[in-house]
Amino acid sequence: MEKRIGSILLAVCLLLLASCGAKRETVAVEPDIAAQSSVPEADLTSLRQLSQEGALWQLDGTTLYTTVAAPQSRGKLLQTVDLNTGKRQALCSKPGCTHQDESCGAWLDCESEIAVLPMEDGRLVLVYGRYGPLEKQGAELSAAVELRDTSGAVLCPATPLPHRPSGAFYTDEIAVYYLREQWQEDGSADVSLIRIELDAAKGFGQASTAAFWQLPVMLSLTERCTEQGMLAIRWEHRMEGQTQVVQHRELCLVQWDGTVRTVAEAKDEQAFLVPDTGAIAAFCFDSATGTMARLDLATGESEPFARLPEGLQLTEGSACVGNVLICNFIQDGEAKPFYLEKGGEPVEIRRQTSHNGYLRPAMVLDVLEDGRLIVDLGDLEYEESYTDQTGQWITSRTSETLLGVCTPEQYREGAADCLTLETNHKF
């Protein structure tokens, strides 16, 4: 049985940060960086992010969508979890169904990554790697998109996509979009914003390029978008002895109209933090003084936000809820998440969770619309038994990740009072 939620990688970004930059004027970029749209009806200014890479899938904070391996066949089963009660059920309306194999209404012909993208009108867009007739010997790994309603009924059947998507997904409520990056030998990237049609009358599943950029070597998209475009960070690296240090230079907005606007400029050893989930925001941390500042994305101006211990180094994993920032640092080689409230004292989150026998801090995985957090509570280990292809009875140990829902304030206190979501093992 597979794990539902992958581990959050705590890879240290060796950043020594100082202060935030000032307002800069919009600058036009070279023609080869300009966005090119082949979809006139695409309204990119209304795009909202549906998920981040490896994210949980939920829309309004009431229902979580997830998948598990089908117990008695290949493929997967689509399940829902009520985020107010923690109860889990298969997304299947067949009377008397046992939810075991491909006869279940929740079954998907899926063998790898899947994205469940809830739309505001109640439809579910499913994007996943495929088994079966779409997979040709020696061909590029295939993917499919299909459309279902909230009962699990298929509205548009699985339709092949030209390549397998990865990373974040976006929507304008008419279509869904994702970024496709193709790296060149010189380190630059050809980045396409791919649009997937959802209207059956216009060719459900048809993929087209809504925007295209040729980004220079050291300009990296963050996957967070605003009405104007995609947030990005321009960076460079330098050597300190035998250590390569990544150093941010500019926080930028790669705009839909093909220009790149510098939001804030770094000096000396400065860098920026764009939270992975929750509110779209940008921060600047000074490692030498422990000062965290918040940036205005329109003007680039900064205001003090919080002060932390000196010498911390930012690492991956962050969430923003109103005036609360939760982010992860490395101190003396150890990962430490902190709860920061504007103008308040920082609180180190000391709750530890176990993953494959290793302890690590309880991590925030997503932010719900009502401001609650989905938190990784560690692994639930248990025995499972099954009959293999030879008819032999097999017993083995496996695990799945426990998830909890809590308010930011409950998380600050160690998430002891959080709502624990029902696991597939219990289900």
Spans of features found by a protein language model:
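Residue-level signature of beta-propeller blades and closely related beta-rich strand-turn architectures
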Residues: 70, 130-132, 182, 236-237, ...
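Repeated scaffold domains used in trafficking and secretory/extracellular systems
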Residues: 49-59, 100-118, 162-173, 214-227, ...
